[in-house]
Amino acid sequence: MPLGRAPRIGVGGPVGSGKTALVAALCRSLAPSLRLGVVTNDIYTTEDADFLRRAGVLDPQRIRAVETGCCPHTAIRDDITANLDTVEDLEADTGPLDLVLVESGGDNLTATFSYGLIDRQIFVVDVAGGDKVPRKGGPGVTLSDLLVINKTDLAPLVGADLGVMARDAAAARGPRPVLFTSLTADPTAGDVTAWVRAQLADLSPHGPRGATPAAAG
C-alpha cells in the first residue's frame, strides 16, 4: 500500500445483497475507535450515500458519492478515475483517515475491484438467491479477499441450505475466508468487523490509530 494514504477496502456484490447495510454496520462498529470515510457508487443517483447520511453512521462530510453513469464494474475496475479522484478529495478534505470503504454499485458475480483503487475487497452475496450462488462462482465469489454470505436468517424461508453454501464456497475459494452474516441477528457485523481490523493491522506497520492488539487481531 502506498505511504501517505488510508487503507481502502472495497465492498461489492449483486443488487440487494446487503452491501450498504454492511457498510453502515461497519461504520457503527469501527467509528468509535477509527476515523472512517465512505465512497458509494450508483449509476444515476446518490441513493446509497444518502441512506448512510440519514442513518447518521458518520459525519456527512466523510460520505461521498460517485454517479457512474455506466455499469458499476466499469467504475471500480476498468476506469477507476472517478473513484480515485473522489477518494483522494475525501482524504484531502477530511483526513487523515484510518480507513476508506468504497462500495460498488450492485452488479453480478463477475464484478471485482481494481487493486489500483483498493487494497482489499469484500464480496457480498445473500441466501435469498438460493444455495446455488457460491457454486456458480464468478470472480467476485472466487477471488475476493473475503466472501460474505449475508441474510442467513432468511435461509429457512427460501429453502437455502447453509451447509451446502459453505461447502461450495470452500470448494470455489480454497483458503480464502468465508463469513456467514445476519445483520438482523448481529447488527454489529462482528465477524466482518474483526476481519477488517485484522486487515488494517496487516496493511499498516503500526496498526490504525485507536486499535489495540486485541481489537486488531
UniProtKB/Swiss-Prot annotation:
Single Gene Ontology BP annotation: urea catabolic process
A Pfam family it matches: cobW
UniProt-annotated location(s): Cytoplasm
Disulfide bonds: none
Function summary: Facilitates the functional incorporation of the urease nickel metallocenter. This process requires GTP hydrolysis, probably effectuated by UreG.
NCBIfam families found in the cross-reference section: ureG
Family (UniProt): Belongs to the SIMIBI class G3E GTPase family. UreG subfamily.
Name under which the protein is recorded: Urease accessory protein UreG
Protein source organism: Frankia alni (strain DSM 45986 / CECT 9034 / ACN14a)
Gene giving rise to this polypeptide: ureG
